[in-house]
Amino acid sequence: MLKNNEILETISMIKEQNLDVRTITLGLSLMDCACEDVKVLSEKIYDKITKTAENLVKTGENIEKRFGIPIINKRISVTPISIVAASCNCNSYLSIAKAMDKAAKEVGVDFIGGFSALVHKGFTESDLKLIKSLPESLANTDIVCSSVNIGSTRYGINMDAVKLMGETIKETSLITPDGFGCAKLVVFCNAVEDNPFMAGAFHGVGEAEKVINVGVSGPGVVKKALEEVRGKSFEEVAETIKKTSFKVTRMGQLVAKEASKLMDIPFGIVDLSLAPTPAVGDSVGRVLEEMGLSNCGTHGTTAALALLNDAVKKGGLMASSYVGGLSGAFIPVSEDECMIEQSKNGFLTIEKLEAMTCVCSVGLDMIAIPGKTSASTISGIIADEAAIGMINNKTTAVRIIPVPNKDIGDIVEFGGLLGSAPIMRVSPGNCDDFISRGGRIPAPVHSLKN
């Protein structure tokens, strides 16, 4: 039986501490749309998305009204387009991206992901077509998101893909305002198939025909809970985070089950990730500072983040039988008001953020760098992050934005959930010769599991 104080606590979490469901994401297979004619394929994709997702937004709104739980985004993820379009006789997949964009707008969702390729061991012709289509596709669509998986613990890092993605990010930044197209492009190592968060979501080939995945949020709730244990031991800190994560995940489970029932689509997973926003009171950085750091980014930050990430998982696992996605704590610089501030103050650098990615979800996320940064330097940043993921058997990623005509200390405004970011310093050295070697970095010895 529910107690009055538990009901009031939940209301307080939603009204005062920015607790919300960050996204309901419909994962959708497009395998049955395959066709040699790219025009016919685009039409099939449009028809399938609009038919399957026609009630997604309405369902989310109904759940919001019924339970009083804010659901910030409704999204769609689809099978990686390089697989779906492999039989097409064409040179570019721009028309497919436009069909995805049009369909997503028709059903009213915020983003659609899956304009993606999986090239961790090598390229197919279709993979290369998709990657070469990325700059114009991101420039000519509004809500299409893309991802490319360039490495894995099992197979190593495809350095040819790393080089190509550095060049692709650079080109995309030059043909989209303030490099904004790069905010819709993620480069992964060890990408997961059931991620509900953008821009890296795609519907994996091992997934069902269609599925509902939910991503929760709630850093403000965790910070409020930690205020009650100031000065206490780390055991109490971890226990407090675990209990809070359980409550947050339970809410996500409720929303996922309800959406699944209303849409008659199987429930997939709840992603436990703490996802910040630029709003005050909704920051992962402030959670770390609440543990006793004067500034997010100072010494001790990586340890605090490791504790947070692990405790979130332990608490969330007890609240749902199906936990998946990325599940941890996100550190997107432009989307976290504390990290924006500490980047301006010099406490958060790319090097420190890279260290933090060793112990949390994903990687270098929503980081703005000078527009003059070379493609090979971007590739070097991707390679470093991929190496962390490969060696540690975890998902890492890079979503980095070279901003044309901006330099260190300038500010770029993206707006909405994407926030704003100071232009961060990159190393003045170069890695041109390293990146130009090509080939594949071999998988680590612990990849041999059999």
Swiss-Prot record:
Q: Assembly state and interactors? A: Homodimer.
Q: What is this protein called?
A: UPF0210 protein CPE1497
Q: Where are the transmembrane segments?
A: none
Write down the SUPFAM superfamilies for this protein, in alphabetical order.
PFL-like glycyl radical enzymes
Which cysteine pairs are joined by S-S bonds? none
- The superkingdom listed in its UniProt entry is Bacteria
Q: Which InterPro entries match?
A: UPF0210
Q: Name one Pfam family in it.
A: DUF711
Native organism is Clostridium perfringens (strain 13 / Type A)
Q: Which family does it belong to?
A: Belongs to the UPF0210 family.
